[in-house]
Amino acid sequence: MVTIRADEISKIIRERIEQYNTEIKIVNTGTVLQVGDGIARIYGLDEVMAGELVEFEEGTIGIALNLESKNVGVVLMGDGLMIQEGSSVKATGRIAQIPVSEGYLGRVINALAKPIDGRGEISSSESRLIESPAPGIISRRSVYEPLQTGLIAIDSMIPIGRGQRELIIGDRQTGKTAVATDTILNQQGQNVICVYVAVGQKASSVAQVVNTLQERGAMEYTIVVAETADSPATLQYLAPYTGAALAEFFMYRERHTLIIYDDLSKQAQAYRQMSLLLRRPPGREAYPGDVFYLHSRLLERAAKLSSQLGEGSMTALPIVETQSGDVSAYIPTNVISITDGQIFLSADLFNAGIRPAINVGISVSRVGSAAQIKAMKQVAGKLKLELAQFAELEAFAQFASDLDKATQNQLARGQRLRELLKQSQSAPLTVEEQVITIYTGTNGYLDSLEIRQVRKFLVELRAYLKTNKPQFNEIISSTKTFTGEAEALLKEAIQEQMELFLLQEQVEKN
């Protein structure tokens, strides 16, 4: 017969009791009351934070935006077709954040930083909050380095500096995206990381931009964040913040970044849709009262950091679409007041064949010549004034029948200056080439040519200087100044090229 030893049993029981540990896990849960149109109303979730992520039973993630006395309004990051009334929801205790790393360069991702280009996962060991506070006053320094766009009209008269916010505004089909993509192409070799955020665009338009960047080798230093027109409003609203978080990751690592939001009108519309469905009170044009804050907290994240923080920068080029040139609508006026200047693209100029269709008269940069190299300041100083006087004269000349010689000369000069500002798409020019072009125009060397010959002559002159006078480019790039020696070289080249050009034209005529 087996004897039961009490001491052994009590020892085992004692050990088991010591090993037992109570682990209580408290989960903040709620119940779905109503779901539809990308919005869910949740009962419960008493301790949820504003902007906290919540998880539904079937895996959909949402953001708690409306914290009301009886329920919580949640916007869904997906279609939410499988969510049922009465199903449970749990609060995650996290605010929206995305993984960040160098691995994102050259990739196309969505607003949740998931790759959508079919090239596999992106590895990252770090994450950033989608909504981070903007750098404070002490963390910044004033903008002083140029960010060259490669477009003469912008770099000479509406200069953009690293850390600036410059709005690109105009009607649909006036070349807003073209200005932005040309700026990305021009950053090749400039050690600038570019982030292109497409909000509510056609998938075909985004694909076209990505193809252009790939063909020109610009995807190496670019990240594309895309939420197309068929994406849920929540993701269209989040996409710009995702792009900003990625750009900030590089900015705080002492790098220079350029971010393009294409476009903020679509983001505002997505936010309006969400707000109205959440039954927030509508304001002007049915936008909610905090639509200004929507854009200001995004654009304030662009900055030029102080030397203590490593002098990184984030330059923002937001795009806003106007309806038949109405700049006084709600969203355009909001974004104009937040940014440091605007580039206004006009449909009339575009249709008249002036491309890029920049209306120089009402475009401004509030950073101004602080964001230009000395050589550009030296040659471009009188360009804006001459063009403004020409526009005034041209309007007056339509009514005058006989004009004196001086007025005729001024009109002829203005037409040639307007001609030299024209550029083909995806053909950005270096600063040296821009200096050559502007100097030739403002000093009257083009006055003897017919208007149709201007562009051809300038292309040949730039090529001639590159091959026959390489020291000109060296002087400008090393000293950043248009020295007397550089001017002498340029004058020489213009005379030599002009003789060649006129001979060539003569031969072609005969």
From Swiss-Prot:
Q: GO molecular function, one example?
A: ADP binding
Q: Which GO terms describe its cellular component?
A: chloroplast thylakoid membrane; proton-transporting ATP synthase complex
* Keyword tRNA processing tagged: no
Q: Which range is the signal sequence, renumbered to this chain?
A: none
The positions annotated for binding ATP are 170-177
Reaction catalyzed: ATP + H2O + 4 H(+)(in) = ADP + phosphate + 5 H(+)(out)
Keywords attached to this entry: ATP synthesis, ATP-binding, CF(1), Chloroplast, Hydrogen ion transport, Ion transport, Membrane, Nucleotide-binding, Plastid, Thylakoid, Translocase, Transport
SUPFAM superfamilies named among the record's database cross-references:
C-terminal domain of alpha and beta subunits of F1 ATP synthase, N-terminal domain of alpha and beta subunits of F1 ATP synthase, P-loop containing nucleoside triphosphate hydrolases
One Pfam family cited in the UniProt record for this chain: ATP-synt_ab
**InterPro entries to which the protein is assigned, alphabetical:** ATP_synth_asu-like_sf, ATP_synth_asu_C, ATP_synth_asu_C_sf, ATP_synth_F1_a_nt-bd_dom, ATP_synth_F1_asu, ATPase_a/bsu_AS, ATPase_F1/V1/A1_a/bsu_N, ATPase_F1/V1/A1_a/bsu_N_sf
Q: Which domain of life is it from?
A: Eukaryota
In the bilayer, the protein is annotated as: Peripheral membrane protein
Q: Which family does it belong to?
A: Belongs to the ATPase alpha/beta chains family.
Its function, per the record, reads: Produces ATP from ADP in the presence of a proton gradient across the membrane. The alpha chain is a regulatory subunit.
Q: How does it assemble?
A: F-type ATPases have 2 components, CF(1) - the catalytic core - and CF(0) - the membrane proton channel. CF(1) has five subunits: alpha(3), beta(3), gamma(1), delta(1), epsilon(1). CF(0) has four main subunits: a, b, b' and c.
Q: What is this protein called?
A: ATP synthase subunit alpha, chloroplastic
Record the organism. Answer: Lotus japonicus (Lotus corniculatus var. japonicus)
